[in-house]
Regions:
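Hydrophobic alpha-helical transmembrane segments in multi-pass integral membrane proteins
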Residues: 32-39, 86-94, 98, 138-155
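Loop-to-transmembrane alpha-helix entry segments
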Residues: 13-18, 48-51, 67-87, 95-102
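Hydrophobic alpha-helical transmembrane segments of multi-pass integral membrane proteins
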Residues: 1-6, 21, 74-80, 100-104, ...
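Hydrophobic transmembrane alpha-helices of multi-pass small-molecule transport proteins
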Residues: 2, 61, 70-91, 109-110, ...
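Hydrophobic/small/kink-forming positions within alpha-helical transmembrane segments
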Residues: 23-32, 55-60, 86, 109-113, ...
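Specific alpha-helical transmembrane segments that line the substrate/conduction pathway
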Residues: 26, 35-69, 108, 194-200
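Helix-helix packing/entry segments at the starts of transmembrane helices
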Residues: 31, 47-53, 118-139, 174-200
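Hydrophobic/aromatic residues within transmembrane alpha-helices
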Residues: 37, 64-66, 70, 122, ...
């Protein structure tokens, strides 16, 4: 995400602590917890499903901190979605969900929700510059987590043994899923009530 974008895109006119808050919640927190959950045996399909709990966390935090009203139709939609997530998760993955993995995915969802609130508090800025410069604060934490999990030799081995498919996946995550996806997402969240956007 950082290179070469950080060299080409101007830093958004917000304080550094807001950029740090954005990077450490919606980027490092969300994906750090998610990838750690996968490493302890959490099924990928179930992780992708349960991380949508960010909707519930976002609506709750927005009501508490931003004083956004929670309308009855929002509550009904949340209840229906929660029941649906529960039924799908229990039905398809019964017995295949490690407790540690579950807690880590929920932490990822909570981090995503916090990131949504940060975007809302920052207000209307160029979402592309926010994504790029916010990720300046993720480089060191991600590096430390990788070294903690795999060690320097393990990290180097994984990099050196990656196939072209692996590198294609990295590029897709960095420049399509993150830049394109989160630029669009951030633009919506900054302009609308987060309780309206988060279920999307």
């Amino acid at each position: 995400v950082l290179l070469p974008a950080v060299l080409l895109i101007r830093r958004p006119p917000v304080r550094w602590y807001w950029l740090a808050a954005y990077g450490t919640t919606i980027s490092f927190g969300q994906f750090g917890f998610m990838f750690t959950a996968l490493s302890v045996g959490m099924p990928t399909g179930l992780a992708a499903l349960l991380v949508q709990a960010q909707v519930f966390f976002t609506v709750l935090i927005a009501a508490l901190l931003l004083h956004e009203p929670v309308k009855p139709n929002h509550l009904l939609a949340i209840v229906v979605a929660a029941v649906g997530l529960l039924l799908i998760g229990v039905g398809q993955y019964s017995g295949a969900m490690p407790l540690a993995g579950l807690m880590l995915v929920l932490c990822a969802a909570f981090s995503w929700a916090l990131g949504n609130i940060v975007v809302k508090r920052i207000g209307r800025v160029n979402p592309l510059s926010l994504v790029v410069w916010g990720n300046v604060f993720t480089l060191i934490p991600f590096t430390l987590v990788a070294l903690w999990q795999f060690g320097a030799e393990g990290v180097w081995q994984q990099i050196s043994l990656m196939s072209w498919r692996g590198w294609a996946g990295v590029l897709f995550l960095a420049y399509v899923a993150t830049l394109v996806g989160y630029v669009g997402w951030g633009g919506l969240v900054s302009r609308q009530a987060v309780s309206k956007i988060s279920p999307l």
